[in-house]
Structures are given as structure tokens and as C-alpha cells.
A protein has these predicted regions:
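Non-catalytic, mobile gating and regulatory segments of ester bond hydrolases
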Residues: 1-194
Length: 194
């Protein structure tokens, strides 16, 4: 039986031929655990450029109602393709040539191969990724990361990174036994509205 890396390598049909499905969601969710290069736009930078939904409502200009409504509904998606992100991160190298940060107990070569398989696959390579947000606070015992993907159809897919195997990750997992929501859950609930 194949695994998610096999799927990322072999399922090359485009989304028009085979619509987005659970396995694709798993690929994008797994990708959120990997390193995200600097070329992927950060949510804070996007918000400073376009504002939050609340900011866009306040900036409505009755002299330009059509443009204002478009910006209100859907600001432009700032993103880079998965292929470009892979190139920025790995520079075409067959082995990881950077300090891999987000793999936990996973072999960095496996992480590298997974990223490269997605970037080389026509099904995934053109998907854009943006609005990356990452927070890590040892004092608050919280970690959070999310990235938004833009599919060729125009649909957005939000992928959240769960806790990792760090001490902060373990503490956050234990905190969930008696605290609701933990700070990362509150941030996750706020993320789509930003």
C-alpha cells in the first residue's frame, strides 16, 4: 500500500480531471509542517497592505463602490507557487541544503523528498501558498502555524500545523486537558477572518 509521498509523486491529474479530495487536503496539511521559505507572504505583511476585514469595511469608498466591494469581499491573494517555494528552499538540490526546522522526529531527507515531490507534480506545483502565520511562545506554552493555499479553481484551503514534539508542544497538549481554548486554538479560530 502506498503512502502520502507516493500519492504526491504519482497522482498527476489536474483538478479539472480529478477534483480536490481528502488525499489532496492531507498533502497540503502535511506541507504545513515543513519549513516555509521567506518568499511565502506572511499574514502580518498582507494585513498591513490590505487591512483586516474590519479595516476594509472602514475604508469603503462610496466614490468607487465596485472596487470597494471587490476589496471588501476578496482582497487579492498574495502567494507564491509551491514550485517556487521549493526552489527557494532547496535550490534544486537533491538533498536538504538548509537547516530543517519543522520535522520533529522525521528524517529531514523524507521531508525534503515530500516537498520536492509536490513541487515537481503538475497537480500541486501551481498551487499558490500565502498568508503564512507562525507563532511560538515558550512562556505561554503555545505554538501555532497556518498557511492558506489557492487552488486553480479559486478555492482557498487553510492548513493548520498541530503541535510538534518540542517541550512546548507537549505542554500545550497537556494544557488541552484542562484549558479550553488554549491560545493556539483561539488563534486558529481567528485566522480565517483576518
Amino acid at each position: 500500500m502506498g503512502n502520502i509521498i507516493d500519492y504526491a509523486r504519482t497522482e498527476t491529474r489536474d483538478f479539472g480531471e480529478l477534483p480536490f479530495r481528502e488525499a489532496d487536503a492531507l498533502v497540503l496539511a502535511q506541507l504545513s509542517y515543513d519549513d516555509v521559505p521567506e518568499c511565502v507572504p506572511r499574514l502580518d505583511d498582507i494585513e498591513s497592505r490590505y487591512g483586516t476585514l474590519h479595516d476594509r469595511v472602514k475604508q469603503f469608498d462610496p466614490r468607487h463602490p465596485i472596487r470597494s466591494v471587490r476589496m471588501l469581499r476578496k482582497p487579492p491573494f498574495d502567494g507564491v507557487t509551491i514550485a517556487r517555494a521549493d526552489d527557494e528552499l532547496h535550490h534544486g538540490s537533491a538533498v536538504p541544503d538548509h537547516n530543517v526546522e519543522n520535522v520533529g522526529l522525521v528524517d529531514p531527507q523524507v521531508t525534503h523528498d515530500f516537498y520536492h515531490a509536490i513541487a515537481a507534480n503538475p497537480r500541486f506545483s501551481g498551487i499558490e501558498m500565502g498568508a503564512f502565520l507562525e507563532q511560538f511562545d515558550g512562556d505561554e506554552q503555545t505554538q501555532f502555524a497556518a498557511v492558506t493555499y489557492l487552488l486553480p479553481s479559486g478555492a482557498l484551503v487553510v492548513a493548520y500545523r498541530g503541535t510538534d514534539d518540542s517541550l512546548v508542544g507537549w505542554k500545550e497538549d497537556f494544557n488541552m486537558a484542562f484549558q479550553y481554548p488554549v491560545p493556539a486554538q483561539a488563534t486558529a479560530a481567528d485566522y480565517p477572518g483576518r
